[in-house]
Amino acid sequence: IDAESNFYKFHNAAVHRGAHQLAEEATDAFEGARLKVANFIGAKEDEIVFTKSATESLNLVAYAMGNAEPGTRFALTSKDRIVVTEMEHHANLIPWQQLAARTGAQLSWFEVTPEGRLDLSKINSVITEDTKVVALTHQSNVLGTINPLEAIVARAHEVGAVVVLDACQSVPHMPVDVKKLGVDFLAFSGHKAVGPTGVGVLWSSLLNELPPFLFGGSMIETVTMTSATWAAAPRKFEAGVPNMAQAVGLGAAIDYLTGI
């Protein structure tokens, strides 16, 4: 609360958009928060995208895949499969339902056992050779189950699929290192990490391979009246004026979690 309040009182200006002192201070605070988030999950700064929520982060990935050029790595067709689990939050289920509907891809899922765990007994028949995406929660917000990522990630990568991880519950409650997890995309929200509402995070080392999600200011490299080129990630996915104070507040929350 103090971090957000101080930002609004003393540093409030649109980031990346001015050469005056206030804009420079705002940009430094915003990018400082990005560095804190990156360090907290073992990532690089340019792999961190600020969104308004984990829901938006997951939708960003699914929507961008739906916009991928045919024949590129993330383009899906009716010959492809998307895998989720029965324990997913709606934020990590419905975007993939919609992507399957848009592209004709088949949606499949891991079932949950009576003990509240994923049934991996048929992992090879769920994650098949034609699977392009495996999306799952790290820790269930309903059951508390911590999913066994190692086997799932290994099988997904064996068939060339990417793994999208909903880490909303795990990031605030346990050490999370994206390199050790081996996943390809990871999302979490600010408010579940004792931070503000209105801010979320998307991490990936593959961001520059995806097309943009939104278009507008701050995300372009060049623009004419007939065309535009995109800035490099993460700015490519941060169109418009971002939730600056909320990002700074999340940075303060990360400081708190780091100190526990």
Give the role of each language-model region:
Residues 1-260:
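Pyridoxal 5′-phosphate
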